[in-house]
């Protein structure tokens, strides 16, 4: 794809889309299947950069799998135990947090030296809270460049026991510990320090561990107990849910310029917290319909809101650009963890919203957006962040064209995004 893509004004946005698999679920499923006893057939696996980094890492660790030509079905021959390296090994994981954090914990159960590294931005994304927790359980972990950040060298040694972990920056640290804990020698008892962010992502982790045969004692998301000495059991077939975060752009498009858009692959029983993005659209005035395997949204007049968005941090970015089309200001609160994602999303979002004419107040953990009377044509910097590119595609639903720089960055989670988006666009 070219280095910039100009989207022309769209008159109407409507249709149906079947969602690609969830990134969060895909990488969890691959790691669980790799360590399980038996064969797991994964269906609707996401084909994206982040998932390819996980697949490449598992292959380097001796995991055997067969990937379909379309890369959405994968048959994994589980190891029936912990991942291990045959000799010293370095794994490059790009900017994939859903690979870096869980693999750091999983490989702390092994005996060989493994180095985990990635792109420059990955080396700016904190991992100290996870490393501190792993060390409490006996793991030997070295920082190779800057303390608290990748790259890290893992020497094994994690046995479980009493562990406390700070949950205030990223839920991925807790997810990593939970997924590794069943294979530790001892029972693992985890206590959460601070406010646990992105709690619905922990619900995903617990549900998936259950699907692979492991139960976790969950005491109000403040304390967790995991029995040691277990082996995950392959569920034979596992269907990866559609990506609820990806659904947000299409549902928002309908709320802004529908028509009606129906997204399939998720529904009222989805385990992903980001399905509640649709509830936020409803609070803003859109009409939403829920089915067992779909969510539909229809346009209505939108108004600004003031809400805590901690439970849906990724989908909340889409509310920031949807706010450009609402009457009155919108305030998104409790979103500090935007700052430690693929880029500092609070700063990036504030900067680009101002380009299209919005008045924006950027706080430490909040964003207040006042929409302009008329959106301005702009060239949007995407900061190598897939969600910035997809969020700002919605600007085209005004009477104004928008140019997206580096549109290919959507390959991280949704390589086909702009083709799918265009298929629902009815030009002016």
From Swiss-Prot:
State what this protein does. Answer: Catalyzes the transfer of the enolpyruvyl moiety of phosphoenolpyruvate (PEP) to the 5-hydroxyl of shikimate-3-phosphate (S3P) to produce enolpyruvyl shikimate-3-phosphate and inorganic phosphate.
Q: Which InterPro entries match?
A: Enolpyruvate_Tfrase_dom, Enolpyruvate_Tfrase_sf, EPSP_synthase, EPSP_synthase_CS, RNA3'P_cycl/enolpyr_Trfase_a/b
Subcellular location, in the record's words? Cytoplasm
MF terms (GO), sorted A to Z: 3-phosphoshikimate 1-carboxyvinyltransferase activity
Q: Know the name of this protein?
A: 3-phosphoshikimate 1-carboxyvinyltransferase
The residues that hold phosphoenolpyruvate are: 23, 97, 125, 172, 345, 387, 412
- Organism of origin is Edwardsiella ictaluri (strain 93-146)
EC number(s): the record gives 2.5.1.19
Its keywords, alphabetically, are:
Amino-acid biosynthesis, Aromatic amino acid biosynthesis, Cytoplasm, Transferase
- Protein's pathway: Metabolic intermediate biosynthesis; chorismate biosynthesis; chorismate from D-erythrose 4-phosphate and phosphoenolpyruvate: step 6/7
Reactions performed catalytically: 3-phosphoshikimate + phosphoenolpyruvate = 5-O-(1-carboxyvinyl)-3-phosphoshikimate + phosphate
What assembly does the database describe for this protein? Monomer.
> Which residues does UniProt mark as catalytic?
314 (proton acceptor)
Which is a Gene Ontology cellular component entry for this protein?
Answer: cytoplasm
Protein family (similarity comment): Belongs to the EPSP synthase family.
Q: Which gene encodes it?
A: aroA
What GO biological process term is on the record, naming one?
chorismate biosynthetic process
- Positions binding 3-phosphoshikimate in this chain are 23-24, 28, 170-172, 198, 314, 337, 341
Q: Which NCBIfam families match?
A: aroA (TIGR01356)
User: Which top EC class is named for this enzyme in its record?
Assistant: transferase
- CDD domains in alphabetical order: EPSP_synthase
């Amino acid at each position: 794809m070219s280095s910039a893509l100009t989207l022309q004004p769209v008159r109407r946005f409507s249709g149906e889309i079947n969602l690609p698999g969830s990134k969060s679920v895909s990488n969890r499923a691959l790691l669980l299947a790799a360590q399980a006893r038996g064969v797991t057939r994964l269906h609707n696996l996401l084909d994206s950069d982040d998932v390819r980094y996980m697949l490449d890492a598992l292959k380097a660790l001796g995991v055997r799998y067969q990937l379909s030509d379309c890369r959405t079905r994968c048959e994994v021959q589980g190891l029936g135990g912990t991942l291990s390296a045959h000799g010293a090994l370095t794994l490059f994981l790009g900017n994939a947090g859903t690979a870096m954090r869980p693999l750091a914990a999983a490989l702390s159960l092994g005996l060989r030296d493994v180095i985990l590294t990635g792109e420059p931005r990955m080396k700016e994304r904190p991992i100290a809270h996870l490393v501190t927790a792993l060390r409490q359980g006996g793991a030997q972990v070295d920082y190779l460049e800057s303390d608290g950040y990748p790259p890290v060298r893992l020497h094994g040694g994690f046995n479980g026991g009493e562990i406390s972990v700070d949950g205030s920056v990223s839920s991925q640290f807790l997810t990593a510990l939970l997924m590794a804990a069943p294979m530790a020698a001892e029972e693992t008892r985890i206590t959460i320090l601070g406010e646990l962010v992105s709690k619905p992502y922990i619900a995903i982790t617990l549900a998936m561990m259950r699907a692979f045969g492991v139960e976790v004692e969950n005491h109000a998301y403040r304390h967790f107990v995991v029995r040691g000495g277990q082996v995950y059991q392959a569920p034979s077939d596992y269907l990866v849910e559609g990506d609820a975060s990806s659904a947000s752009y299409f549902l928002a498009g309908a709320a802004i310029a529908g028509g009606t858009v129906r997204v399939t692959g998720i529904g009222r029983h989805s385990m992903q917290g980001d399905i509640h993005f649709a509830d936020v659209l409803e609070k803003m005035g859109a009409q939403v319909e829920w089915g067992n395997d779909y969510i539909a949204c229809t346009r209505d007049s939108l108004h600004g809101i003031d809400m805590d968005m901690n439970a849906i941090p990724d989908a909340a970015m889409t509310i920031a650009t949807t706010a450009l089309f609402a009457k009155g200001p919108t305030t998104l609160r409790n979103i500090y963890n935007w700052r430690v994602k693929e880029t500092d999303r609070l700063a990036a979002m504030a900067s680009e919203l101002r380009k299209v004419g919005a008045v924006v107040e950027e706080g430490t953990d909040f964003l207040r957006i006042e929409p302009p009377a008329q959106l301005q044509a702009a060239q949007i910097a995407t900061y190598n962040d897939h969600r910035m590119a997809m969020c700002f595609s919605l600007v085209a639903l005004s009477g104004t064209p928008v140019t997206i720089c580096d549109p290919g960055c959507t390959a991280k989670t949704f390589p086909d995004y702009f083709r799918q988006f265009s298929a629902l666009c009815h030009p002016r």
